[in-house]
Amino acid sequence: MAQTDKVRVYGKAQNRTALGIIHAWALAYPNGTLEDLRAAFPNSLNPDKGTKENFILSHEKGTEANWDGYFKEPEEILLLQDGSQVSVVKMWTKPSFERIVAKAKEYGIVVAEFTEAEKGFGKKGGFRLEYLNGWTPPVVKKKCKLCWLWLLLALLAIAAAVYFFCFYGK
């Protein structure tokens, strides 16, 4: 483990581990957009995915154009800071998985050996994340959309108080 490692992904099944890598990236880069995600993990990492893109907006999943090739459950959907809901492609062959694991290291994301998911109908794998070296996800400060209005009201209140005390405070 390197000192620059931020997150370790433990996964059950190869594709769930890849999903965990993407979720870890989103934690590390909370202001990231879909375009940033596509730049960080380009389509060239996963050429055999059977879809056009590694990541799509979740409302696009399940269309004839992309079949059922994306994670679609609510807990699998990636929610970006800009409000975008992103679905991640499901198919990750061994070579593609090895490429995304190598790429993830550039962002301080390491993968523990994944374990096989339980076999059988309705069984699916999962992932969990462990923060390393004292790292915690950055807290995104919410932008105050009406800050100027609050500032204006405060200035008006101060002006009214000064006026009141100057003319009626005697």
Please identify what each model-predicted range represents.
Residues 1-170:
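Intrinsically disordered, charged low-complexity linkers and terminal tails
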